[in-house]
Amino acid sequence: MKDYKKMLKDLEQQEKELVFSEFTNETALNIGLIIIENAKKDNKKITINIEKNKQQIFHYAFDGTSPDNDDWITRKNRVVNRFYNSSLYIGILLKDEKKSIEEMYHISSFEYCPYGGAFPIIMKDVGVVGVITVSGLTEEEDHNMVVSAIREYLNNINSYK
């Protein structure tokens, strides 16, 4: 049996650590390219989407993906934009409470998808300004693909300071 409480604490910690001092369209491009390179290395077929202030500023779909991946992205993004947490966090919270998104929040699972892969773009002293999303793998793999790219990007820029 999974320890949902520990998973929630770990996800909360990720959201505290993975914070940007700025997030520009160039930032989105760089993170998107990191995700592409990591997916190529692992031979993964995914769709990537990055939005800032609800404007799409990066999108890439590997061969072998479909419009279904875009639909998953839209539904995962709605979760982040509503709750200001990663879609995986909300999914784990629901599992811990043993409730569906309909039961707990009275919203449609056709519109809101509480599965991993969408991670909030969190700006220091501002809060959530967007979302980085991957679709095409398991929910944990989608989530980890985004988190590892953000971590790599932040580590790279912090090493130059």
Swiss-Prot record:
* Name recorded for this polypeptide: UPF0303 protein CTC_00911
The record lists the organism as Clostridium tetani (strain Massachusetts / E88)
Q: Which NCBIfam families match?
A: PRK02487.1-5 (NF002696)
Please give the superkingdom of this protein's source. Bacteria
Q: Which family does it belong to?
A: Belongs to the UPF0303 family.
Question: Which InterPro entries does its entry note?
Answer: PduO/GlcC-like (IPR005624), PduO/GlcC-like_sf (IPR038084), YBR137W-like (IPR010371)
| SUPFAM superfamilies documented for this protein | GlcG-like (SSF143744)
